[in-house]
């Protein structure tokens, strides 16, 4: 029943390095713990989606990113919240990846997607990636 629920705006980064893209494993103690996802998080009040993504990448991975165009937007209903996830094409412009929040981080090829258990909100995005739509 989505009609009476507040939508939580969430942003994430699709970061490529040659033919691999970055995924992050959620900490065990958080909701959807140990599932894989794209780096990102909630948009704070007064922030643009792009500002939120830059902040989240800094907080979670200690890197600065440039935010490009929207790769895809999905609306997903979890039992505990309704999210609108906006995934941006992004690139690391400075800093070295550090795991400041996640359990693990990996660079994977598209054909490796089935080897990882992802957050349900990412499923349609992953399908688009597997169809070869960069």
Where are each of the predicted segments found?
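Active-site-adjacent beta-strand/loop module that shapes the phosphate/pyrophosphate-binding cleft
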Residues: 64, 72-96, 106, 129
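NUDIX/MutT-family hydrolases
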Residues: 89, 98-129
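Conserved N-terminal beta-strand and adjoining loop/helix that marks the start
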Residues: 2-22, 42
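Conserved hydrophobic "DFG−1" position in protein kinase catalytic cores
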Residues: 15-16, 23, 90-92, 107
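Hydrophobic packing within well-folded, soluble alpha/beta domains
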Residues: 49-57, 70, 88, 105, ...
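Conserved Nudix-box catalytic region and its N-terminal flanking loop in Nudix hydrolases
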Residues: 20-59
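Short secondary-structure junctions
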Residues: 60-67
């Amino acid at each position: 029943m989505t009609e009476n629920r507040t939508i939580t705006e969430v942003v994430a980064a699709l970061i490529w390095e040659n033919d691999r893209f970055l995924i992050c494993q959620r900490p065990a103690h958080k909701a959807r713990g140990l599932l894989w996802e794209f780096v990102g998080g909630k948009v704070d009040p007064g922030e643009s989606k792009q500002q939120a993504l830059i902040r989240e990448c800094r907080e979670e991975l200690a890197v600065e990113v440039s935010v490009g165009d929207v790769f895809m937007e999905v609306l997903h209903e979890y039992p505990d919240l309704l999210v609108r996830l906006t995934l941006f094409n992004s690139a690391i412009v400075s800093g070295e990846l550090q795991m400041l929040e996640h359990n693990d981080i990996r660079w994977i090829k598209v054909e490796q997607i089935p080897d990882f258990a992802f957050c349900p909100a990412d499923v349609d995005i992953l399908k688009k990636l597997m169809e070869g739509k960069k």
